[in-house]
Amino acid sequence: MERVAKLSTEKAVVIFTASNCPMCHTVVSLFSDLGVGAAVHELDRDPLHGRDMERDLARRLGRSPPVPAVFIAGKLVGSTDRVMSLHLAGKLVPMLKAAGAIWL
């Protein structure tokens, strides 16, 4: 969907979430703790486009619910499991630096 593609490039890190999703909160908190000013889009709070974006993300991720869905430098990284795996392997911070999301 065009809207997800457009929004996913608005900042170095973009996270699609739902307001009632505990794992979404965890992922957003992780990026915040790392000093990333991510763009966060809560799909359930967008009455005009939320459902369409949710379907598009479910198709891209191959699962439902599709949140959280994390994009770094406009590329879909994945959901909680993928983000946490990258972080534990020491690969997330270099990705964020390369994307210009953090400078330290």
Curated annotation (Swiss-Prot):
Keyword annotations: Cytoplasm, Disulfide bond, Electron transport, Redox-active center, Transport
Disulfide topology: C21-C24
Protein location: Cytoplasm
GO cellular component, one term: cytoplasm
Domain called Glutaredoxin: residue spans: 1-103
Main localization category: cytoplasm
Free-text function comment from the UniProt entry: Has a glutathione-disulfide oxidoreductase activity in the presence of NADPH and glutathione reductase. Reduces low molecular weight disulfides and proteins.
Family the entry assigns: Belongs to the glutaredoxin family. CC-type subfamily.
UniProt-recorded name of the protein: Glutaredoxin-C15
Biological source species: Oryza sativa subsp. japonica
